[in-house]
Amino acid sequence: MPPVEAKHVGTPSGVWFDEACTPTGPEVCGNAIDDNCNGLIDEGCGLSIARVQFEVAWSEPTATVELAVSDPVGDVIDSSHRATRSGLKLDKKCPQDGCSGQNVDNVILVADAPMPGQYTVTIRLVDPGKGSLPVKAHFGWRVGDRVSGTNLTLRSTDEKKDFSFEL
């Protein structure tokens, strides 16, 4: 398989990715973090993993957070569209996919190689549920051998966080 790399990564204003990895012990399921620093996010937790993976996790059990990914031709993965022609697949959509209290959305690339171009990842709070605002979330991503992530604070249903990845 050809190597996969992110040539450029864009973040919303005031958001930074944590590129350093400090092992904290065994993998903790449902947090979108590479806890054991082996280059994989939430492996062994019932989620699919791939060379291109975008995952968001949140702790408020009644909240709904949406992870949407658009590919270079504009096809979108979201709660209504679970696959694109370019090979993106919505692997897990919580809480509707029976997530056993671990709220995650997970999008992976099932194709051998990504379509070249810009991928846009949008994370938004759909419903805070019975919890109070803000809702805390963590966005983790993997492109090839590069794994990173950031903590997010979602303050309202009008707010969204957009990230761009040039592959």
Task: Give residue ranges: language-model regions.
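Extracellular calcium-associated, cysteine-rich motifs in secreted modular proteins
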Residues: 1-51
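Intrinsic-disorder/low-complexity signal
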Residues: 43-167
